[in-house]
């Protein structure tokens, strides 16, 4: 199958499983639960990832004043590409074993403002796409990457992220299809801002990308 046919097939495939996206404002009365932010991490020679992580942790500690815990799951030097999905799944399993009811998957180069903070402290009765507040880079509705808050029940029901996506790209699309199959809608915050710490765009670095992400997403749908 040539690349253009594959891309067209992928578009049809995504339309078949339409995401249910709902605008969402912070409720007036919020009930808090034990919450943890799970950060998948892997340093590389192309970007200042360690420096970003060193800024990320104290920023969140100051912003949330101990109301949310942080778990960093680091991939070893295994001579393979970054596997964000597998790292997040590991983090979620560890978090569940420790009694956390709310798990937020979060890229470590994204920093929320004080308004966005309120969505982090809101129980996700349905997944809350916190990354929707990251407007400087992604503005299309189907984007569900960057940061996602989910409750334990929805994580188990959707089976989390795929474990076999190596390199940047695709695991969020696969999660979206899994959620769609289980009729789980995604809430989109309408206020607040998330800003990205500047670094070289991963999409431009071939060595870091998942070069078969379209095939990977389609395969995940057919086998999951």
Kindly give the residue locations of the regions a language model identified.
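N-proximal low-complexity "stem/linker" segments adjacent to membrane-targeting elements
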Residues: 1-58
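Hydrophobic targeting segments
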Residues: 33-39, 60, 69-72, 91
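A recurrent flexible, glycine/aromatic-enriched loop bordering the glycosyltransferase active site
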Residues: 134-150, 157
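A conserved catalytic-core signature of glycosyltransferases
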Residues: 143-151, 162-163, 169-170
């Amino acid at each position: 199958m040539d690349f253009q046919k594959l891309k067209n097939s992928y578009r049809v495939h995504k339309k078949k499983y339409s995401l249910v996206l709902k605008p969402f404002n912070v409720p007036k009365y919020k009930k808090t639960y034990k919450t943890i932010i799970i950060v998948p991490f892997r340093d590389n020679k192309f970007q200042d990832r360690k420096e970003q992580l060193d800024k990320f942790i104290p920023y969140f500690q100051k912003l949330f004043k101990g109301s949310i815990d942080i778990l960093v799951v680091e991939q070893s030097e295994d001579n393979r590409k970054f596997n964000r999905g597998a790292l997040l799944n590991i983090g979620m399993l560890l978090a569940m074993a420790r009694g956390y009811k709310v798990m937020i998957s979060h890229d470590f180069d994204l920093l929320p403002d004080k308004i966005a903070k309120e969505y982090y402290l809101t129980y996700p009765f349905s997944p809350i796409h916190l990354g929707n507040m990251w407007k400087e880079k992604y503005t299309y509705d189907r984007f569900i990457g960057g940061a996602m808050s989910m409750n334990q029940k929805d994580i188990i029901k959707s089976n989390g992220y795929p474990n076999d996506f190596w390199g940047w790209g695709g695991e969020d699309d696969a999660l979206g299809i899994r959620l769609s199959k289980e009729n789980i809608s995604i809430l989109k915050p309408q206020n607040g801002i998330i800003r990205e710490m500047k670094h070289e765009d991963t999409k431009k670095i071939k060595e870091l990308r998942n070069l078969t992400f379209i095939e990977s997403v389609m395969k995940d749908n057919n086998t999951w």
